[in-house]
Amino acid sequence: MKEYIPSKIKQELGISYLGGCNSPKLIKSYGRNVLTYGVYLAPHNISGYDVCPESCNCRQYCLHGSGRNKIELLKNREGGPIQNSRIKKTKLFFEDRVKFMHLLIHEINQARRKAESNGMKFAIRLNCTSDICLEEFVLDSKNILQLFPELQFYDYTKVPSHVELLKKYTNYDLTFSFDGENWDTCKKLLDSGLRVAVVFEESIPTEFRGYPVIDANGDDARFLDEGGVICGLTYKKVANDYVNGKYQRPDTTFITRNKKTNQ
């Protein structure tokens, strides 16, 4: 049987890690005593593989272009170390799933031990900048949800078929995402008790289209939120919003225009 050594996989690929617990977005969940292990892949088709099948309205404004990567992309539109690393990880997923899974499982176990030693809840978000069905994360005929049935997984998604996974796996939680054009699907899911994320340009209202809104900016632990509500998120400026160094207001239905009054 072939042995897969995590350190060698990373060395061969030229990366320091596959995922982690220290991104600014995930660290916010510390406030709810949750340690989250998350994986950031190269979004939509940057890597040559499309990992975001429903991203036509949001790909230009993806959080991939925020934070430290925003600085790198503003210096060089072709990307720097962060984007290159995410591309390598994405290619590994599609081109050598076995290696990817061995490394993923190793890092999940490491992060779980860290959470346990700190007395924290543990959660896993594999689609921080992607929207891949978790049944595709497979090793030895078992997907990641089956390999870790005792652990809490969660994601945001714009893919309606992914919602079907909630009927099969009790350890998976999803928040559906409004893209400006899929309200009929969002309404149906809200009425069934699912949460829906809406990105607002300015302040977070208390109500949107007749549904209560909670402020979801404070943490990423959506699986702890109640169902049937709108999770309001404030838009974060990304590298693609800047032309010749000047900010250009995004023109997309993905971002809900709002004032400081209820919608």
Predicted features by range, described:
Residues 1-263:
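Class I S-adenosyl-L-methionine
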